[in-house]
Curated annotation (Swiss-Prot):
Start-end of each LRR repeat: 32-53, 125-149, 150-172, 174-197, 198-221, 223-244, 246-267, 268-291, 292-315, 316-339, 341-362
Compositional bias segments (type: Pro residues): 408-571, 579-768
Entry GO MF terms: structural constituent of cell wall
InterPro entries: Leu-rich_rpt (IPR001611), LRR_dom_sf (IPR032675), LRR_extensin-like_regulator (IPR051582), LRR_N_plant-typ (IPR013210)
Swiss-Prot/TrEMBL GO biological process terms: cell wall organization
Residues bearing attached sugar chains per UniProt: 98, 293, 344
Swiss-Prot/TrEMBL keywords: Cell wall, Cell wall biogenesis/degradation, Glycoprotein, Hydroxylation, Leucine-rich repeat, Repeat, Secreted, Signal
Listed name of the protein: Leucine-rich repeat extensin-like protein 5
GO annotation, cellular component aspect: extracellular region; plasmodesma
Region Disordered: start-end pairs: 406-776, 817-839
Role summary: Modulates cell morphogenesis by regulating cell wall formation and assembly, and/or growth polarization.
């Protein structure tokens, strides 16, 4: 009985306590409601908390910006710009270099990194036409208010720590011509909002964390350059790839697999293509023989099978060909080695059984780890016998042709090209990519119309990733494109150190010399009357992608995205950026040579990966093509990669002659290690025996990369961004593409983000810290001593990466560029191991100037 009584009493006590607590809470809440006891600090704290989680209808973050009534603005557009920039300033969590310190007051045109110019539709009023915060090491996110910058033509924020997604209200930026978000920490699926930008020509999303499939509309859009390498994109490429009018496309270091679309042969304007470091597992389509303008062709480090199509002999502009680390077999067609401009042919780590003698006379070639009789460093007889015992490969079984669905009334899939995108190639309905196995020979002829004359096709001289034999045998991807220096990137601005540009002050970087003939973009672009928006000429900062530590060093470099001819951005007052040189669009595809179907090779057995060429870097760097900035007017930074030019003469400069100070780059050989930064547009010289002589580091202007001759001596790298240092020489960027800029768009002398000052290059950790984290500590300087090249005729170790000087938009002081001594081709002797202090390795072979500096991880 006592126990029962105690239990009842206990239950009663709990009930009474609950009732007491309930009524106490209600009374306290009522007292707060009626008496308003919250202090101002408490109210402010609650407001900030609410704003932190505020989202618009798209889920984008916004900020609460109050405009002081006492502020006076020249016009409503500058008032909107004030709201947008103040919201962005609130969204910045860390600004270690004080780029946004002077973002105060109504004079937004004096803000650091902000450039104004006359509006296209009303020349009597000023508006914000360009933003350049490259290499600022800023952490934060992009608020939705940036959609208020409706007159913006250039938006460059590479090499920062921005995270999150791209705001949906970016679709209001109807005049945006160049978008460079590279080397940040953006994540999520492909930012489809960029497909709604009608004037967009240059898209650079490299070195982020984007994932998922790539939308078909991307290849139906009228772009000139696509750089999506070093992300996490997956799945197969859409079969309408050939509809794209781009001159440069880099999808390296992702997770693509499946077929190489046969429509690839329809890309009539294509000059550089880098598909390395993926998982493509089909045959090379014979239709690639139609690509008459391609200078750099890199499909290394995939799982491609079959034989090399004899139609490759029709790619008459080819300079760099890299198919290493695949499962190719059969005999190499003699027509390939007889290409008139071929400087480097790398086909190591395959299962080829025949090699024509003419290939041995190429300036640079690598045939190691094959099954070639009477050649050194081949696979073991057991490996070759095991591979030859496999059944032959039937290339038709992959079903890599375009979807052959009959023109039923089936509505085209929602993958219709986004506004402004180039129409899909004719005769092919934009039906979802069906994997109907059509013979690869069925590429639809209707390649997407070439992008307007503004297409800054990188000079054909860009070296292919293949490295010349002179350098060590390691097939590191660092081969830099040997593009002749004649392609000074238009408006390439000298790379200025990442120091925050003082408002209105031009960065200390040497003045960017306008690329020869640099003219404002031709009016072919949709923008209304050109506004002279002074955007800093974006010289190709080392676009080199940070080396992926785990990936084997591919012999071919990844081309850094050449910044398309900067849209005519209004010239910022006082800025002496070199005029952007519109490179003439490349001629349409020459009549496609009849593609010969690749011989069915034996079924590819997993390639036996021989030891990667002696690449010194512990982590195999993925070759990245870094667009060298225009050499004009800037002291060339020493090329980070010792890309010794092959014996053949340097490719003739495209329509542009390189700045007088730069001699034409001789064909360069790939050095085993990819240098992190792209070499400046300077003539590249074969590495001289003495390693002590480093080439001078050129200053990069972010926008269009000018051809960079390779200096053998190791340059110092300025930024630390890439994860694992790559040892690989990036080829010189091709001559500056001749861009016809959008007609009315303002001529921006846009200095695209120059590479950061010589920061110490430490491989960035794979995982990015939370976007909120403050500026990361500077990476430790790492001195890599690449081993000397093993045998001549192989990769020569790249020279130390060049020191990049980032040039902020204002005209940098004139820098005296002393050209390095004429290239001495020492095939056997590699340049001294470069000291890798810079950021991500450049993507060799790309003549584009928009350089995403390596991210600071």
């Amino acid at each position: 009985m006592k126990t029962k009584m105690m239990m009842k009493n206990t239950s009663l006590i709990f009930v009474l306590l609950f009732i007491t607590f309930f009524f106490t809470s209600i009374s306290y809440s009522l007292s707060l409601t009626f008496n308003g006891d919250l202090s101002d600090n408490e109210v402010r704290l609650i407001t900030q908390r609410q704003l932190l989680y505020f989202r618009d209808e798209f889920g984008d973050r916004g900020e609460n910006v109050d405009v002081d009534p006492s502020l006076v603005f020249e016009n409503p557009r500058l008032r909107n710009a004030y709201i947008a920039l103040q919201a962005w300033k609130q969204a910045i969590l860390s600004d270690p270099n004080n780029f946004t310190t002077n973002w105060i007051g109504s004079d937004v045109c004096s803000y650091t990194g902000v450039y104004c110019a006359p509006a296209l539709d009303n020349r009597r009023i000023r508006t914000v036409a360009g933003i350049d915060l490259n290499h600022a090491d800023i952490a934060g996110y992009l608020p939705q208010e940036l959609g208020l910058l409706t007159d913006l033509a250039l938006f460059h924020i590479n090499s920062n720590r921005f995270c999150g997604t791209v705001p949906h209200r970016f679709n209001r930026l109807k005049l945006l011509f160049e978008l460079d978000l590279s080397n940040n920490r953006f994540a999520g699926i492909f930012p489809t909002v960029v497909l709604q930008l009608p004037s967009l020509k240059f898209l650079d999303l490299r070195f982020n964390e984007f994932e998922g499939p790539v939308p078909r509309e991307l290849f139906s859009k009228d772009l000139d350059a696509i750089f999506i390498n070093h992300n996490r994109f997956r799945f197969e490429l859409p079969d309408n790839l050939g509809d794209s009018p781009v001159s440069v496309i880099v999808v390296a270091n992702n997770h693509f697999h499946g077929c190489i679309p046969t429509s690839l042969g329809d890309m009539r304007n294509l000059e550089e293509i880098i598909f390395m470091e993926n998982g493509f597992n089909s045959c090379l389509p014979s239709q690639i023989g139609r690509l008459k303008n391609v200078t750099v062709f890199d499909f290394s480090f995939n799982e491609l099978v079959g034989s090399l199509p004899a139609s490759i002999g029709g790619m008459v502009s080819m300079e760099q060909l890299n198919v290493a680390h695949n499962r190719f077999s059969g005999k190499i067609p003699a027509t390939i080695c007889q290409l008139p401009r071929l400087e480097n042919f790398t086909f190591s780590y395959n299962f080829f059984t025949g090699e024509p003698p003419v290939c041995l006379g190429l300036p640079g070639f690598d045939d190691r780890r094959n099954c070639l009789p009477a050649r050194p460093a081949q696979r073991s007889p057991g490996q070759c016998a095991a591979f030859s015992s496999l059944p032959p490969v039937d290339c038709g079984s992959f079903g890599c042709g375009r979807s052959t669905r009959p023109p039923v009334v089936v509505p085209s899939p929602p993958t219709t090209p986004s506004p402004g995108g180039s129409p899909p190639s004719p005769s092919i309905s934009p039906s979802p990519p069906i994997t109907v196995p059509s013979p690869p020979t069925t590429p639809s002829p209707g390649g997407s119309p070439p992008s307007p004359s503004i297409v800054p096709s990188p000079p054909s001289t860009t070296p292919s990733p293949g490295s010349p034999p002179t350098s060590p045998t390691t097939p590191t991807p660092g081969g830099s494109p040997p593009s002749s220096p004649t392609t000074p990137t238009p408006g390439g601005s000298p790379p200025s150190s990442p120091t925050t540009p003082t408002p209105g002050g031009s960065p200390p970087s040497s003045p960017t010399t306008p690329s020869p003939g640099g003219s404002p973009p031709s009016p072919s672009i949709s923008p209304s009357p050109p506004i002279t928006v002074p955007s800093p000429p974006s010289t190709p900062t080392s676009p080199g992608s940070p080396p992926s530590p785990s990936s084997p060093t591919p012999s071919s470099p990844i081309p850094s995205p050449p910044t398309p001819s900067t849209p005519p951005t209004p010239i910022s007052p006082g800025q002496n950026s070199p005029p952007i040189i519109p490179s003439p669009p490349f001629t349409g595809p020459s009549p496609p040579s009849s593609p010969s179907p690749p011989l069915p090779p034996v079924i590819p057995s997993p390639p036996i990966v021989g030891p990667t060429p002696s690449s010194p870097p512990p982590s195999t760097p993925t070759p990245v093509y870094s667009p060298p900035p225009p050499s004009t007017g800037y002291p060339p930074p020493p090329p980070f990669t010792g890309y010794s030019p092959p014996s053949p003469p340097p490719p003739p400069p495209p329509t542009f002659s390189p700045s007088p100070s730069i001699p034409p780059p001789p064909p360069q050989t790939y050095s085993p290690f990819p240098p992190p930064p792209p070499p400046p547009p300077q003539t590249y010289y074969p590495p001289q025996p003495s390693p002590s002589q480093p080439p001078q580091s050129p200053i990069y202007g972010t926008p269009p990369p000018s051809p960079i001759p390779y200096l053998p001596s190791p340059p110092q790298f300025a930024s630390p961004p890439p994860p694992a240092p790559y040892y690989y020489s990036s080829p010189q960027p091709p001559p500056p593409p001749h861009y016809s800029l959008p007609p009315p768009t303002p001529t921006y002398h846009y200095i695209s983000p120059p590479p950061p000052p010589t920061p110490i290059h430490s491989p960035p950790p794979q995982s990015h810290p939370p976007c909120i984290e403050y500026s990361p500590p500077p990476p430790p300087t790492v001195h890599y001593n690449p081993p000397p090249p093993p045998s001549p005729a192989h990769y020569s170790p790249p020279p130390s990466p060049p020191v990049y000087y980032y040039n902020s938009p204002p005209p940098p002081p004139a820098v005296h560029y002393s050209p390095p001594p004429p290239p001495v081709i020492h095939h056997s002797q590699p340049p001294p191991p470069p000291i890798y202090e810079g950021p991500l390795p450049p993507i060799p072979g790309i003549s584009y100037a928009s350089p995403p500096p390596p991210p600071f991880y």
